[in-house]
Swiss-Prot record:
Lineage, top ranks: Bacteria, Pseudomonadati, Pseudomonadota, Betaproteobacteria, Burkholderiales
Catalyses which reaction(s): N-terminal L-lysyl-[protein] + L-leucyl-tRNA(Leu) = N-terminal L-leucyl-L-lysyl-[protein] + tRNA(Leu) + H(+); N-terminal L-arginyl-[protein] + L-leucyl-tRNA(Leu) = N-terminal L-leucyl-L-arginyl-[protein] + tRNA(Leu) + H(+); L-phenylalanyl-tRNA(Phe) + an N-terminal L-alpha-aminoacyl-[protein] = an N-terminal L-phenylalanyl-L-alpha-aminoacyl-[protein] + tRNA(Phe)
Gene: aat
Alphabetical list of InterPro entries matching this protein: Acyl_CoA_acyltransferase, Leu/Phe-tRNA_Trfase, Leu/Phe-tRNA_Trfase_C, Leu/Phe-tRNA_Trfase_N
Any single GO BP term: protein catabolic process
Full protein name: Leucyl/phenylalanyl-tRNA--protein transferase
HAMAP family, per the entry: Leu_Phe_trans (MF_00688)
Length: 255
């Protein structure tokens, strides 16, 4: 039985989330509210909301957990050429927090294979916009010829980034934003991006699954660190093109 959380009820232990044999593996709790304080508490515990319009707020903590270690980000030969062009041509820009709400709306409207509608509801946009105004949620945006053509958004506490969604209106535009995020996080010694659930696209870029207990233990440590700055210079992306992945960082989490 999934517990119902009242406004003052704490989250149960993530170990109580439904298991693989259930119809909803990883489902931990449900509630009527999506208050910013609840959202902040959730992320700090390795929990995230995911639900559709008309449903209660559903809170999840799956096991295993999909992550991307910045040092393990994979760049194909073709995408390497794309990044070099982005660095070389002024018509390409990478902006941070220029249009956070616009990125969220674009992610909500992006078609997803096998998915009808969107989980990025008006309530979700309002809640994450509140986190953004507080400096806890950020957008990385790809701009071409003065037009936003792709991007992603997520939540950041300490030295931990929790990815939420991405979209592209031009070829590789979301991947460019992800590469910029990876470069920025590497620059500031962030060791893990939470990707929540496994997808073949994330796996092709270096994402992998780790045990929930390993993930939660890392989150607990990382969110206690001082926050990283969110000023960005696209030249940091050059570091991705000339540096091999760090074996030390790559081996820091159980496979």
């Amino acid at each position: 039985m999934v517990p119902w959380l009242g406004p003052d009820d704490p989250f149960p232990s993530v170990e109580r989330a439904l298991g693989a044999a259930s119809g909803a593996p990883g489902l931990l709790a449900a509630s009527a509210d999506l208050l910013p304080s609840r959202l902040i508490d959730a992320y700090r515990r390795g929990i995230f909301p995911w639900y559709s319009d008309g449903q209660p707020v559903l809170w999840w903590s799956p096991d295993p957990r999909m992550i991307l270690v910045p040092a393990e980000f994979r760049i194909s030969a073709t995408f390497r050429k794309t990044l070099k062009r982005v660095l070389r041509e002024p018509r390409w820009e990478i902006r941070v927090d220029c249009d956070f709400a616009g990125v969220m709306r674009a992610c909500a409207q992006a078609p997803r294979r096998g998915q009808r509608g969107t989980w990025i509801t008006a309530e979700i946009i309002d809640a994450y916009s509140s986190l953004h105004r507080a400096g806890d949620a950020h957008s990385i945006e790809t701009w071409l010829d003065g037009r936003r053509v792709g991007g992603l958004y997520g939540v950041s506490f300490g030295r931990m980034f929790f990815g939420e969604s991405m979209y592209a209106h031009a070829s590789d535009a979301s991947k460019i934003a992800l590469a910029a995020l990876v470069a920025h996080l590497r620059e500031h010694r962030v060791e893990m991006i939470d990707c929540q659930q496994n997808t073949s696209h994330l796996a092709s870029l270096g994402g992998r699954e780790i045990a929930r207990k390993t993930f939660v233990a890392h989150v607990r440590r990382a969110v206690a660190e001082p926050p990283i700055p969110w000023r960005f210079d696209k030249r940091v992306v050059a570091g991705l093109l000339g540096q091999a992945a760090s074996a030390t960082a790559a081996d820091a989490f159980d496979r």
